[in-house]
């Protein structure tokens, strides 16, 4: 695998697919992980209607389509649609021939073995890639931060994981998953804005609320105190202009929505918040490496982009950890794409080139080769 062929890096998230070329510092293509099919066949005959649409095109035509997310909580659940997303990635977004490039794919922590095999099989048999590799998302985020040991709190659109990593290897017994992420926060914000008298119900309106969330929400350092401030003054109020020109005002919703990350009971969930989950993950690790984990807590994924989240994590973990423990939260500015960036770094390392699963190895051993070569 010489330098003349650029490897492709594809990070398939529940909400967005990030794709591009190894060695680049950012993904070339970022589009929604959705596949849409016409609700009524035959209505648009003669308009050159396709039987399916992917990504932004599906998003823009959603009025006439039924939308599906093939990746739920980070795990691929619909392989036919997943294949369509990959096809769209290669041919429409990156405009490359997959049979000419090695492909690095990412997977969720604790991804079922059968899923890794299926990804491997599709790459070699459907797309005829010359070589491929499957890497764990959180591990790539850690690499992107320049570390090989630490605990990654990776929170995207569909799922949140805490993943302790020691010298480059994820520790599976200590990985914890929380089914609370960006999509849930958007839904919760829709709900509390409705209480204020604004109605957001359709999928189109959900996109507006997602934008409000991304632009105006933040994490309070002290929730109770912030609620008190919001009640006694209008200092925290912000206005937002809707696409139709109407202007809405949003106050304590700005920090009430992301607070659910720390208090899942807001969403009617019984699970521990992200701070406790991180702590529980660390406590499942050998006592000798805990210090290294507390000192390297790396935030990753779009749902860690809220202003104030790092300071709040620092405060909450300090309260949980032994009093002498040094705690450091690392929040890289590019953390929305750090999984992809880590993949770009890994796939362009000269030492990584012998790690690829080649077509020859696949033909000889079959899909199970992925468990021997990717760990």
From Swiss-Prot:
Highest taxon above the source species: Eukaryota
One Gene Ontology MF term: hydrolase activity
Sequence intervals crossing the membrane: none
Principal localisation: cytoplasm
EC identifiers of the protein: 3.6.4.-
Keyword ATP-binding: yes
Alphabetized Gene3D superfamilies for the sequence: 3.30.420.40, Actin, Chain A, domain 4
Reactions catalysed according to its record: ATP + H2O = ADP + phosphate + H(+)
InterPro entries for the chain: Actin (IPR004000), Actin/actin-like_CS (IPR020902), Actin_CS (IPR004001), ATPase_NBD (IPR043129)
Pfam families for this protein: Actin (PF00022)
Keyword Nucleotide-binding found: yes
SUPFAM superfamilies noted in UniProt: Actin-like ATPase domain
GO cellular component, one term: cytoplasm
Compartment annotation: Cytoplasm, Cytoskeleton
Post-translational changes noted in the entry: Met-1 may be removed after translation.
Described purpose of this protein according to its UniProt entry: Actins are highly conserved proteins that are involved in various types of cell motility and are ubiquitously expressed in all eukaryotic cells.
Family indicated by similarity: Belongs to the actin family.
Additional remark text: There are at least three actin genes in A.castellanii.
Protein name in UniProt: Actin-1
């Amino acid at each position: 695998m010489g330098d003349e062929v650029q490897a492709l890096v594809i990070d398939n998230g529940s909400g967005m697919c990030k794709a591009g070329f190894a060695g680049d510092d950012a993904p070339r293509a970022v589009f929604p992980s959705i596949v849409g099919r016409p609700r009524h066949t035959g209505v648009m005959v003669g308009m050159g209607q396709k039987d399916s649409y992917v990504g932004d095109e599906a998003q823009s035509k959603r009025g006439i389509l039924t939308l599906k997310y093939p990746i739920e909580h980070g795990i691929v659940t619909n392989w036919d649609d997943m294949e369509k997303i990959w096809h769209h990635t290669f041919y429409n977004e990156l405009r490359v021939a997959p049979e000419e490039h090695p492909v690095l794919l990412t997977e969720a922590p604790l991804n079922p073995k059968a899923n890794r095999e299926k990804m491997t099989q599709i790459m070699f048999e459907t797309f005829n890639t010359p070589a491929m590799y499957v890497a764990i998302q959180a591990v790539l985020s850690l690499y992107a931060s320049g570390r090989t040991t630490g605990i990654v709190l990776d929170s995207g659109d569909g799922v949140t994981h805490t993943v302790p990593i020691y010298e480059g290897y994820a520790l599976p017994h200590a990985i914890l998953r929380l089914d609370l992420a960006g999509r849930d926060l958007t839904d919760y914000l829709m709900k509390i804005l409705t209480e204020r008298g604004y109605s957001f119900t359709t999928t189109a309106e959900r996109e507006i609320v997602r934008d409000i969330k991304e632009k105006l929400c933040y994490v309070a350092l002290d929730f109770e105190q912030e609620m008190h401030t919001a009640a006694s003054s209008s200092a925290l109020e912000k206005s937002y202009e809707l696409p139709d020109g109407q202007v809405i005002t949003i106050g304590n919703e700005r920090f009430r929505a992301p607070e659910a990350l720390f208090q899942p009971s807001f969403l009617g969930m019984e699970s521990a918040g992200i701070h406790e989950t991180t702590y529980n993950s660390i406590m499942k690790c050998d006592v000798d490496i805990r210090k290294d984990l507390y000192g390297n807590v790396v935030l990753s994924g779009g749902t860690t982009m809220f202003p104030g989240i790092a300071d709040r994590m620092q405060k909450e973990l300090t309260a949980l950890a032994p009093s002498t423990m040094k705690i450091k939260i690392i929040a890289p500015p590019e953390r929305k794409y750090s999984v992809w960036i880590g993949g770009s770094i890994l796939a362009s390392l000269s030492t990584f080139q012998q790690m690829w699963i080649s077509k020859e190895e696949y033909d000889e051993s079959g899909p199970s080769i992925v468990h021997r070569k990717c760990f």
